[in-house]
Amino acid sequence: MITIVDYQMGNLRSVQKAVERSGVEAEITSDASQIAAAERLILPGVGAFGDAIGEIRRRDLEKPIKDFIASGKPFLGICLGLQMLFEQGFEGGTHEGLGVLGGDVVAFELPAEFKVPHMGWNAVDVKDAGADLGIQSGTHFYFVHSYFVRPADPSVVALTCDYGGEFCAAVRRGNLMATQFHPEKSQGDGLRLMQRFATAPVEVA
């Protein structure tokens, strides 16, 4: 069973359907006790950083999410679910993130020929932290975002993407995996990535 966090700002049904297509059941919840008891956890997200982290805190979900990550059980963040893991985001002001990873989230500042938001299919380049993800450099995933993460520790960068310059497309640290792109919208390669998450061994800390 995979648990998907509901804080009213994620494309929950499409994530749930993608999980179920990998042959694993998925539940959607905003209940802290269910999050704490989860076997595997997905934090999705679509929208603005400040609104999202505000909803997480308003619903008292910050501690159970951080405790889950610390437990060593498999965790997947998607889009805003990646960005909120960092210390600060600057979308519509300065907002404190979950602080699970050091670094911040900043806006694209690109030449006029590059449209923002970065929307559509783009290729990724695999780094050392992503070597065991079963992804090859040049694989395309679907992106929709105007901000990107800047990890303080470069060793957590699993995948990068080039859009007017290189940016972090995914991070990996132990049981934690998070992507800027949407695997649930990325057809076969995205579904394979989700299946890999759904079947990853659980190593509880």
UniProtKB/Swiss-Prot annotation:
Subunit field text: Heterodimer of HisH and HisF.
EC number per UniProt: 4.3.2.10, 3.5.1.2
Location of this chain's protein in the cell: Cytoplasm
Catalytic residues (UniProt): 79, 182, 184
Pathway given in the UniProt record: Amino-acid biosynthesis; L-histidine biosynthesis; L-histidine from 5-phospho-alpha-D-ribose 1-diphosphate: step 5/9
The protein, known as: Imidazole glycerol phosphate synthase subunit HisH
Cellular component terms per the entry's GO annotation: cytoplasm
Job description of the protein: IGPS catalyzes the conversion of PRFAR and glutamine to IGP, AICAR and glutamate. The HisH subunit catalyzes the hydrolysis of glutamine to glutamate and ammonia as part of the synthesis of IGP and AICAR. The resulting ammonia molecule is channeled to the active site of HisF.
PROSITE patterns: GATASE_TYPE_1
GO biological process, one term: L-histidine biosynthetic process
Keywords assigned: Amino-acid biosynthesis, Cytoplasm, Glutamine amidotransferase, Histidine biosynthesis, Hydrolase, Lyase
The Glutamine amidotransferase type-1 domain, residue ranges: 1-205
Any GO molecular function: imidazoleglycerol-phosphate synthase activity
Organism of derivation: Rhodopirellula baltica (strain DSM 10527 / NCIMB 13988 / SH1)
Catalytic activity: 5-[(5-phospho-1-deoxy-D-ribulos-1-ylimino)methylamino]-1-(5-phospho-beta-D-ribosyl)imidazole-4-carboxamide + L-glutamine = D-erythro-1-(imidazol-4-yl)glycerol 3-phosphate + 5-amino-1-(5-phospho-beta-D-ribosyl)imidazole-4-carboxamide + L-glutamate + H(+); L-glutamine + H2O = L-glutamate + NH4(+)
Organism domain of life: Bacteria
HAMAP family registered for this protein in UniProt: HisH
Any Pfam family hit: GATase
